[in-house]
C-alpha cells in the first residue's frame, strides 16, 4: 500500500508541482512518502496479499536440506566491517516494522547503511552477502539494476546525487543464526529484496526489480 500510494500520488501530481524547482519538488515528494509510510504502518500487518486478499498458507516451516550457513557467515562478515554507528543504523529486531519500510521511488527516506557511505572493504562485504544469498543470475541482475541507476543519472544531466549505483541501503533484522529467525533487506531505486531465513529455509518476499533504462551500451 505504501508503494501504491506513492505511485498514484506521482501519477496524479498536480501541474503546479511540475513547475516548482527540483529541490522543492523533491522535498514535497519526500514528505508525501513519509506520510504514506506512516499511514501504511498504522495499519496492522496481515500477510502477503494479492489484489487486496491475504494469501494463506503460502510458506510452511520445513527443512529444505540446503544449508544457509554461507548466508549467515556473510552477514556476520558484513557486520564485522561496520563501525558501531553503522551497526546501530543497520540492525533491527527480527519482528521490526523495518521489514515493511521500503519503496521503489528514489526520493524515499531509507533506513540502514548505504553503499555510498561504505568504504571498499564494507562494500565488498555487502556484495558478499548478496552473492551468498542469491543465485548467480540474481546477483548479476541486482548489480545490473544498480549500475543502470547510474545510467539514469547520466540521462538526467549527470544528476548523480539522485541516481547512481551506490544509492542502495542494507538492513539486517535479527541476529544471523543457524536456528533462530533473521533476515536482511536491500532497498533502493528499482531494487528491493526482503530475505528471511529460518534454519535452512529462505523466503524472499516481497521483491521488486525494475530498471530505467532497461539496456545501456557500455
Question: Predicted regions span which residues?
Answer:
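Acidic/His-rich structured neighborhood in mature extracellular/periplasmic domains
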Residues: 21-57, 64-65, 96-218
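Positively charged n-region of N-terminal signal peptides that target proteins for export
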Residues: 1-2
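Mature N-terminal segment immediately following signal peptide/propeptide cleavage
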Residues: 63-101
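Bacterial N-terminal signal peptides
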Residues: 5-15
Amino acid at each position: 500500500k505504501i508503494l501504491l500510494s506513492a505511485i498514484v500520488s506521482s501519477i496524479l501530481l498536480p501541474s503546479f508541482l511540475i513547475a516548482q524547482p527540483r529541490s522543492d519538488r523533491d522535498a514535497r515528494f519526500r514528505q508525501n512518502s513519509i506520510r504514506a509510510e506512516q499511514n501504511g504502518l498504522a495499519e496492522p500487518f496481515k500477510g502477503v496479499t494479492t489484489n487486496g486478499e491475504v494469501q494463506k498458507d503460502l510458506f510452511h516451516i520445513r527443512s529444505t536440506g540446503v544449508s544457509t550457513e554461507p548466508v549467515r557467515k556473510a552477514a556476520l562478515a558484513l557486520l564485522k566491517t561496520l563501525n558501531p554507528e553503522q551497526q546501530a543504523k543497520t540492525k533491527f529486531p527480527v519482528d521490526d516494522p523495518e521489514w515493511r519500510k521500503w519503496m521503489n521511488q528514489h526520493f524515499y527516506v531509507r533506513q540502514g547503511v548505504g553503499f555510498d557511505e561504505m568504504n571498499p572493504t564494507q562494500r565488498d562485504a555487502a556484495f558478499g552477502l548478496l552473492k551468498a544469498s542469491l543465485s548467480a543470475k540474481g546477483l548479476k541482475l541486482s548489480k545490473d539494476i544498480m549500475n543502470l541507476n547510474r545510467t539514469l543519472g547520466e540521462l538526467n544531466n549527470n544528476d548523480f546525487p539522485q541516481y547512481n549505483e551506490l544509492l542502495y541501503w542494507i538492513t539486517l533484522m535479527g541476529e544471523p543464526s543457524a536456528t533462530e529467525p533473521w533476515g536482511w533487506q536491500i532497498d533502493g531505486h528499482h531494487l528491493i529484496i526482503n530475505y528471511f531465513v529460518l534454519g535452512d529455509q529462505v523466503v524472499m518476499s516481497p521483491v521488486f526489480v525494475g530498471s530505467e533504462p532497461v539496456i545501456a551500451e557500455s
